[in-house]
Amino acid sequence: MLVAVLGEQRDAKFRIKNLMFLLILLMLIQPVQAQAYSEVRDDALVCMDATQKFEKKYQIKEHLLTTISSVETGRWNAKTKQKVAWPWTVNAQGKGTYFETKAQAVREVKRLQKAGVKSIDVGCMQINLAYHPDAFKSVEEAFDPEKNVEYGAKFLKNLYANRDNDWIKAAMAYHSSVPRKAQRYKKKLVSAYEMVKQAQ
């Protein structure tokens, strides 16, 4: 009888140890999964979070900064089922490229600069490093979504003040000062604005 009781106690202890091991394992795995989800979510929506924030801060027409960012760097997102701005976008020599990480985008810009390429658009708002040489302290900072979007917001607000307080004219000038290109951009902008407005 005593042997049987001791055997049951050992079995119970074994089960408790196994259960504790499983619980610890789950606790270790769960944060990694949460972090992975957070990273995917952040990369997909980080530009939009920033544009919405700075639209309010600088009193920019609602949805306009978000729309410009989407038109400039829009990438189809399967999770949100819509085109969203991608923070790790580089445009140079007439070619736009979406990189999976910030580090990859930074490396590409440095490679282009080393090769003598001057006109490079970067980040959520596609800030041109040649036209705005003092916008950022470094290439790394240029890809900081908040800093990139805030600079774009200030630039757009300045254009607004110099374009008869007309947001459409300001947005067209944001893209290009060449009338033909600006008009073509306007068509894209108006269409995208309605889509962004409905999505939000």
Region roles according to the model:
Residues 20-29:
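Bacterial N-terminal signal peptides
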Residues 12-15, 22, 76, 95:
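A generic signature of intrinsically disordered, low-complexity regions enriched in glycine/proline
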Residues 1-15:
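N-terminal secretory signal peptides that target proteins for export/translocation
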Residues 36-200:
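Catalytic glycan-binding domains that act on GlcNAc-containing polysaccharides
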Residues 16-18, 187:
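Hydrophobic alpha-helical segments, especially transmembrane helices
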